[in-house]
Amino acid sequence: MENGYTYEDYKNTAEWLLSHTKHRPQVAIICGSGLGGLTDKLTQAQIFDYGEIPNFPRSTVPGHAGRLVFGFLNGRACVMMQGRFHMYEGYPLWKVTFPVRVFHLLGVDTLVVTNAAGGLNPKFEVGDIMLIRDHINLPGFSGQNPLRGPNDERFGDRFPAMSDAYDRTMRQRALSTWKQMGEQRELQEGTYVMVAGPSFETVAECRVLQKLGADAVGMSTVPEVIVARHCGLRVFGFSLITNKVIMDYESLEKANHEEVLAAGKQAAQKLEQFVSILMASIPLPDKAS
């Protein structure tokens, strides 16, 4: 079975949410590992546990609270996922990406993705923020794509383009906003590569990924972006560099999830402030003009 959900399942979940909240979000934000604190910045917040939302999967990873939060961020109507779903939790990609299609049916036109990632680019330091310019869908090389199976034209075309997956205008606005913030470290920009996980990468794998042109590596984000672009959503996103990958066989260091969460905690406030400021740069929907 390529997709266990029908169009009616997505629609029923969207209608349930619309009937349980007065919020009508324009922007959806997916909070990565340790980045759920962004929800604290929402005003008029309304919270739903994933468990109470029809058809919603459950989040099982430390650092992912498993809550959907509606509210306003810097004046912009938002819905935030405080915890995402991953392949390594045993979820098929159609389940990992379920919320994105629901957001589309809620009227969302922009998706912001954030994640914790390992730095492959030797210029990156722990705590850096990388603006995602492009991605490499490594699981896709072996047939793992969230759009696999029959296409539903009500969501989008059979063969969506991915050459412009990350909105160019929003990337330019992010770069100029960062300069205005006067941060000491420059905003990095690069390519994110997704691996399936949950095991961290070997030294040999890190070397291969670097040769492929990847700047940061993680275990999420790409499936949601593919489905969002299929639905016609504007997408932009950021990786918080929480560790530098191990490229040396002589190194005694080991990657671990606790380290990722700790590094994320230190740098998360900077990313949260940045995303909040950027909300004002997102074009208003046509119907509001």
Swiss-Prot record:
Q: Which domain of life is it from?
A: Eukaryota
Pfam families, per database record: PNP_UDP_1
Recite the UniProt keywords alphabetically: Acetylation, Cytoplasm, Disease variant, Glycosyltransferase, Phosphoprotein, Purine salvage, Transferase
| Reported impact of N243D | Reduces catalytic activity towards inosine, hypoxanthine, guanosine and guanine. Increases catalytic activity towards adenosine and adenine
Q: Which residues carry this modification: N-acetylmethionine?
A: M1
Give the sites modified to Phosphoserine.
Answer: S251
Is Phosphoprotein a UniProt keyword of this protein? Answer: yes
Q: Which GO terms describe its molecular function?
A: guanosine phosphorylase activity; identical protein binding; nucleoside binding; phosphate ion binding; purine nucleobase binding; purine-nucleoside phosphorylase activity
Annotated residues that bind phosphate are located at S33, H64, R84, F85, H86, A116, S220
Q: Which GO terms describe its cellular component?
A: cytoplasm; cytosol; extracellular exosome; extracellular region; ficolin-1-rich granule lumen; secretory granule lumen
State the Gene Ontology BP annotations.
allantoin metabolic process; dAMP catabolic process; deoxyadenosine catabolic process; deoxyinosine catabolic process; immune response; IMP catabolic process; inosine catabolic process; nicotinamide riboside catabolic process
Q: Does the keyword Acetylation apply?
A: yes
Q: What class of enzyme is it?
A: transferase
UniProt-annotated binding residues for a purine D-ribonucleoside: Y88, E201, M219, N243, H257
Q: So what does this thing catalyse?
A: inosine + phosphate = alpha-D-ribose 1-phosphate + hypoxanthine; guanosine + phosphate = alpha-D-ribose 1-phosphate + guanine; 2'-deoxyguanosine + phosphate = 2-deoxy-alpha-D-ribose 1-phosphate + guanine; 2'-deoxyinosine + phosphate = 2-deoxy-alpha-D-ribose 1-phosphate + hypoxanthine
The feature of type site (Important for substrate specificity) is located at: N243
The annotated subunit structure for this chain is:
Homotrimer.
- Family, as annotated: Belongs to the PNP/MTAP phosphorylase family.
Q: What does this protein do?
A: Catalyzes the phosphorolytic breakdown of the N-glycosidic bond in the beta-(deoxy)ribonucleoside molecules, with the formation of the corresponding free purine bases and pentose-1-phosphate. Preferentially acts on 6-oxopurine nucleosides including inosine and guanosine.
Disease tied to this entry: Purine nucleoside phosphorylase deficiency: A disorder that interrupts both the catabolism of inosine into hypoxanthine and guanosine into guanine, and leads to the accumulation of guanosine, inosine, and their deoxified by-products. The main clinical presentation is recurrent infections due to severe T-cell immunodeficiency. Some patients also have neurologic impairment.
User: By what name is this protein known?
Assistant: Purine nucleoside phosphorylase
Whose protein is this, by species?
Homo sapiens (Human)
